[in-house]
Amino acid sequence: MLVLTRTNGQAIKIGNEGEITVTVLEVRGNQVRMGIDAPKHIAVHREEIYQRIQEEKPKAPPILEEVE
């Protein structure tokens, strides 16, 4: 994991073309407000929402082995 230190107003760029920007908007106590600018085709979710989406995805049926 890459760990970066940023202060209010500073940003990081993600992707070969820098197409995703994460900007620190505010630090208050133990909370950080971040702004994320990403192309529309890239989904951005909080972790707990992402986990819920993954849990709700339909499960693939098991593959049955062919018997001769």
UniProtKB/Swiss-Prot annotation:
Chief place of localization: cytoplasm
An annotated GO cellular component: cytosol
Superkingdom per UniProt: Bacteria
GO biological process: mRNA catabolic process; negative regulation of translational initiation; positive regulation of translational initiation; regulation of carbohydrate metabolic process
Keyword flag Cytoplasm: yes
Record's keyword terms, sorted: Activator, Cytoplasm, Repressor, RNA-binding, Translation regulation
Self-association and partners: Homodimer; the beta-strands of each monomer intercalate to form a hydrophobic core, while the alpha-helices form wings that extend away from the core.
Protein name: Translational regulator CsrA 1
Organism (species): Coxiella burnetii (strain RSA 493 / Nine Mile phase I)
